[in-house]
């Protein structure tokens, strides 16, 4: 048996998350450089970054797929020279169309670094990823990056954490200067000033704290101690008893408070200028949890329904979550795993409890962005990739064959935008089907379906960029050229009233007839709850073997709603009565009866069309505020908030997606190219009646 290279207490599984352009990938690059993983630093804006390994990422300078990497850290002062730490890093995208990747990564991480742009502080997408991290109870450090940038303001960035996220966050470092004068950082805990000694920031020199910063350092250190003492009893005792608080006391209290999600340490630096990244790595070791310190993951025993806590332990049976599927040009299908308990050797079998199948793991790989190292065994707390799992998809539980468990799965958002694609040539037809299947396996927020009546293929996803990139990947990775239609909004339909309806199907045409009869009560379900079927039949009015056919008949009928043919969603159906015929009843007859019942109900159930409402954040020069407010109201939008930073203003609003097509051009021309906007899905809501009539008319169902 292989022995574990790094004990669990010296392992960190972390993610790097941020708003687009806050410098996340550059920060990861520097971490890899300082931990000895790369010998040459790649810049994102040169298209040479190690973590951004897909062609589109290199061209667009944004991170799309979260790559997993392993790095080894000996400490800024080589303090862990003989006992280094292993840091597994997942680089996540900051672009809103790819929130699925962030969600997917956070589910399997133990800690995270939130990167802020020092000139902007907390931005809209920061709020989204922060909320996601809170959902999964992930402890975080905050790295205020780009301190060398025009307008960089560390105090503003720290304050924005309290103002916009309402969290207890305080600086544990202070920058020496800002913008062009950003020279180094002061460690508030140790009261030390650090200046880089060479261009790439590998050598640093400790100097006395500059005189003009001494008072500020003491003031900020006191603020730090108070903020931590507020949430940590043992530090509070020392603080109130006016006992001496040593460096070790303070560090231990910061660690406890960070792991308890009661405190978020804030650090300063500039990854691009090679300042502050090693101290950030030290903070990862000092303040983020090992797999032993996170709250145990919950799994369920499929036989008893009992909950089981999964605590990292190599001696326990194997349990892991498949959190990402990728197609690799050289080795084929890769399944990324987060191992919670136990160990797994290559060549052994695992039980996929989500799909109830057994699969053999061919090979195991440790990934470094795009290069890989073959390993014989993975241990609890590890992140690795497996080859050979053909049936496994994202969110599946993989456990030992002798001890099957089902891990809490991942939830994926429904797509909000769709467009038609068609292959350019007959030869592309088959390749397109294969490409779409592989892409939707990799990305659960990307869907592809072919309409059986029209033969048209629709792809749907989280935004225009998302779909652009998928079409691009079809061309590059699968050699499929497609023509694309204009993007369309993914509307839905829903009932607003509770109604009861009968569906009775009788057919007599010589020989065996058909008979199915059901009474179903339909009622609206909460948003996002989907379809819920309740079998309330007593006394066998509908025999048990036909119940699944009724449910299936409803599901199929819901694919095309009564108003304009959009999917019917969020519906409860209670089957409470019906009748059958000894000879003529069949599954097919009950399926048809169920769909007739739904069609009948839709006449009186107050059906409405739902549209995706986006949260839109528009940043523009303050002189154009009037234009922007006009844009929002002209697009059926509601303004929620506006904030002024210097001579720019940020307007946050909710606007229907249908009104946002082409807005980039409108905003650009109104602001001479200086305005930008970001939008992400917020919720679905009913469209106004006049809009609904237009949608129905356009769908040709009037």
From Swiss-Prot:
Give compartment(s).
Answer: Cytoplasm
What does the UniProt keyword field contain? Cytoplasm, Elongation factor, GTP-binding, Nucleotide-binding, Protein biosynthesis
UniProt entry tagged with the keyword Cytoplasm: yes
Membrane-crossing ranges are: none
Functionally, this protein is described as follows: Catalyzes the GTP-dependent ribosomal translocation step during translation elongation. During this step, the ribosome changes from the pre-translocational (PRE) to the post-translocational (POST) state as the newly formed A-site-bound peptidyl-tRNA and P-site-bound deacylated tRNA move to the P and E sites, respectively. Catalyzes the coordinated movement of the two tRNA molecules, the mRNA and conformational changes in the ribosome.
**Family of the protein in this entry:** Belongs to the TRAFAC class translation factor GTPase superfamily. Classic translation factor GTPase family. EF-G/EF-2 subfamily.
Return the protein name. Elongation factor G
Q: What is the lineage of its organism?
A: Bacteria, Bacillati, Bacillota, Bacilli, Lactobacillales
